[in-house]
C-alpha cells in the first residue's frame, strides 16, 4: 500500500475557501481602520495649528497661513511654504483660517482629499476657538462618499 504524500485537491480547495472568507471579512475592517487613522491624523495636525494660533494671539499677533511682511501677523505653519496656501499634509485638499483678528475667536478648517481614503475624501474637520480660548473639534462627513460615525477622531463631534 502506498502512503499518501501531499494534500488532496479537496483539502487545498477548502484552505483557499477559508482564506477567501477571512480576506472578505478583514479587508473592509482594514479600510475602516485606515479611514479612522487618517481623520485622527488630520485632527492632530490641526491641533498643532491650535497651539500656534494660541501663541500668536498671546503675543498680540494675527494668525495667518502664509508668511507676510507685517510684524503684526504670525504664520501658524500649516501650509507647505511661506508663500503658499497649499497644506503641508498630503491628506488635506485645503486648509482655511477664518476669524481670530478681532476678538480671538475663529476657526481652522481642513478638507480631506488628495491621498485620503476615498470613503472620507471631502470630509471637513474644523477646530473652533471661542473668545475665551476654548477649542472645539467638529467634523462634517456629509460630503464624503461613505463616511461613518466611527471615523470621528476622539474628541470631535459631528457638525
From Swiss-Prot:
Gene Ontology biological process terms, A to Z: cell adhesion; type IV pilus-dependent motility
Propeptide regions on this chain: 1-6
Cell compartments where the protein resides: Fimbrium; Membrane
Compositionally biased intervals (Polar residues): 67-87
Swiss-Prot/TrEMBL keywords: Disulfide bond, Fimbrium, Membrane, Methylation, Transmembrane, Transmembrane helix
Gene3D superfamilies with a match to the protein in the record: Glycoprotein, Type 4 Pilin
Positions of transmembrane segments: 7-27
Pfam families noted in UniProt: N_methyl, Pilin
Disulphide bridges: 137-156
GO CC entries: membrane; type IV pilus
Subunit structure, interactors included: Major component of the type IV pilus (T4P) that plays a role in surface and attachment to the host epithelial tissues.
Miscellaneous notes: Moraxella bovis can express either a Q or a I pilin, the inversion of 2 kb of DNA determines which pilin is expressed.
Assigned protein family: Belongs to the N-Me-Phe pilin family.
Entry-linked PANTHER family: GENERAL SECRETION PATHWAY PROTEIN G (PTHR30093), PREPILIN PEPTIDASE-DEPENDENT PROTEIN D (PTHR30093:SF34)
Protein name as it appears in the record: Type IV major alpha-pilin
Organism of this sequence: Moraxella bovis
Amino acid at each position: 500500500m502506498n502512503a499518501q504524500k501531499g494534500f488532496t485537491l479537496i483539502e487545498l480547495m477548502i484552505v483557499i475557501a477559508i482564506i477567501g472568507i477571512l480576506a472578505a471579512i478583514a479587508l473592509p475592517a482594514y479600510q475602516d481602520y485606515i479611514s479612522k487613522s487618517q481623520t485622527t491624523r488630520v485632527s492632530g495636525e490641526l491641533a498643532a495649528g491650535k497651539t500656534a494660533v494660541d501663541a500668536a494671539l498671546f503675543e498680540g499677533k494675527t494668525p495667518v497661513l502664509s508668511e507676510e511682511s507685517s510684524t503684526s501677523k504670525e504664520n501658524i505653519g500649516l501650509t507647505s511654504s511661506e508663500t503658499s496656501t497649499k497644506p503641508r499634509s498630503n491628506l488635506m485638499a485645503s486648509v482655511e483660517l477664518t476669524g481670530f483678528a478681532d476678538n480671538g475667536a475663529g476657526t481652522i478648517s481642513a478638507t480631506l482629499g488628495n491621498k485620503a481614503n476615498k470613503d472620507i475624501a471631502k470630509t471637513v474637520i474644523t477646530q473652533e476657538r471661542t473668545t475665551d480660548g476654548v477649542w472645539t473639534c467638529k467634523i462634517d462627513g456629509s460630503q464624503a462618499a461613505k463616511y461613518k460615525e466611527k471615523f470621528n477622531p476622539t474628541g470631535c463631534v459631528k457638525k
